[in-house]
Regions:
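Acidic, Ser/Thr- and proline-rich intrinsically disordered linker/docking segments
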Residues: 329-382
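Cys/His-rich short segments
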Residues: 212-260
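Short, surface-exposed beta-strand/loop "edge" segments at domain boundaries and coil↔beta transitions
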Residues: 297-300, 317-325, 351-358, 362
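Soluble catalytic domains of membrane acyltransferases
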Residues: 4-5, 12, 18-189, 212, ...
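Structural motif
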Residues: 60, 239, 248, 306, ...
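A conserved mid-domain beta-alpha-beta active-site/ligand-binding segment of alpha/beta enzyme cores
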Residues: 174, 185-221
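Phosphoinositide-dependent membrane-docking surfaces
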Residues: 39, 307-342
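Long, charge-rich boundary regions
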Residues: 248-322
């Protein structure tokens, strides 16, 4: 594994830096980063890699990226040019670890988003504990690239840009000496605290404003009316409206809907679903899906069937490449269920991917809330 080509990096990363400059990116450098080093970032938007690349320029950075992204035609060429390291999500990947250490031995800089996926509601997600083990073993200086309000500028539920301010702050979290003295649990706690960012709480204080755009794409995430509890809010311009009682949430220039952040509304909705799960004996969800897996160098639909979640397991019953299959995944071992809001949920097992595409956008949100709750429930009983 080699660091990114210097010539290619200076050109491509330079173009990214110019692009983000005109977008209004502000960079606050509290440190000068030199390799070998690991940079950790919070992950609230798909554009985060652009913001961190700009902040670290002209330093060459090697990114750890989800292995499935290397199978996506619109992303693969850029990942290859940048010599990114493919990483299987939410399971041990010895190949990715080996490549990471090879870059560090070359005095390189490796950038990791420990959350493993973009935060769909604008507040940092819990990071897998494995990040603490990696940092402890690597024993190189660790820095934080904290990206503020990228969620409001480029929300993951929209293809639109909500023009406004994004700020990146670079700071040091650990040096070699502190890493050698800390236990893994202490490292994990400090990492979690350092990369935590709550968009709503931050902007309630700072009041950075953004150009309001239509918010189509938010309704699969915030699907329930807070007044009558009807499921199926409808997005129109910058509003979410309930077709049953006409209650309307208005998205404003500060990223709030009727004074509350997306995360606050999501938490309320999540709590109501969990309450329903707890009150319903043998609560489960089932939905028709299209199964997508690795096919050659890409991703392709390989079958159709029913995907369900119960207290004990996820089950896919259907076809896969012409054969009838039944795949089971225990909820007690699936801590995180990655989701593309409104599109699919994903399962990673033995370096394979199972993408369950759904026609009902709301079910993607209900499925991951239910599955991850059952995981937490299994831990309290063990």
């Amino acid at each position: 594994m080699k660091k990114p080509n210097l010539f290619v990096w200076l050109i491509l990363a330079g173009l990214i830096k110019i692009y983000t400059f005109f977008l209004g990116l502000k960079i606050v450098k509290k440190v000068n980063i030199k390799g070998p080093a690991i940079v950790l970032g919070n992950h609230n938007a798909f554009m985060d890699y652009m913001f961190s690349t700009s902040a670290l320029y002209p330093r060459r950075v090697t990114y750890l990226a989800a292995a499935k992204m290397f199978k996506e035609p619109h992303r693969r060429p850029f990942l290859k040019l940048g010599r990114a390291i493919p990483k299987t999500m939410f399971e041990s990947d010895l190949g990715a670890i080996k490549s990471t250490f090879e870059i560090l031995k070359q005095q390189g800089i490796v950038c990791i988003y420990p959350e493993g996926q973009v935060s769909y509601h604008g507040t940092s997600l819990p990071s897998p504990y494995a990040i603490a083990k990696l940092l402890k073993k690597a024993n190189v200086p660790v820095y934080v690239c904290l990206i503020k309000n990228a969620y409001l500028f480029s929300p993951p539920w929209s293809k639109r840009k909500f023009k406004g301010r994004v700020q990146v702050e670079l700071s040091q979290l650990f040096d070699r000496e502190s890493l050698s003295q800390l236990e893994e649990a202490q490292i994990y706690e400090k990492v979690s605290k350092a990369i935590y960012f709550n968009t709503g709480a931050f902007n309630r204080e700072e009041k950075w404003s953004y150009r309001v755009q239509p918010i189509q794409g938010l309704e699969p995430l915030l699907y329930q009316c807070p007044e009558c509890l009807h499921e199926g809010l409808q997005a129109k311009q910058n509003t979410l409206a309930c077709p049953a009682c006409q209650h309307t949430l208005v998205y404003d220039a500060y990223g709030f809907l009727n004074g509350k952040s997306v995360y606050e509304w999501f938490q309320r909705q999540q709590s109501r679903l969990i309450e329903t799960i707890e009150k319903t004996e043998d609560y489960q969800l089932s939905i028709p899906v299209r199964l997508v897996r690795y096919v050659g160098k890409g991703l392709g639909e390989v079958g159709q069937g029913i995907f369900s979640v119960t207290k004990d397991k996820y089950v896919y019953q259907g076809t896969d490449k012409g054969s009838t299959k039944r795949y089971e995944f225990l909820t007690k071992v699936v801590e995180y269920l990655p989701v593309d809001i409104g599109k699919n949920v994903q399962m990673y097992y033995d370096h394979e991917i199972y993408i369950f595409e759904m026609n009902d956008p709301i079910m993607t949100t209900k499925m991951f809330i239910t599955g991850e709750y059952y995981y937490q429930l299994s831990k309290t009983k063990s």
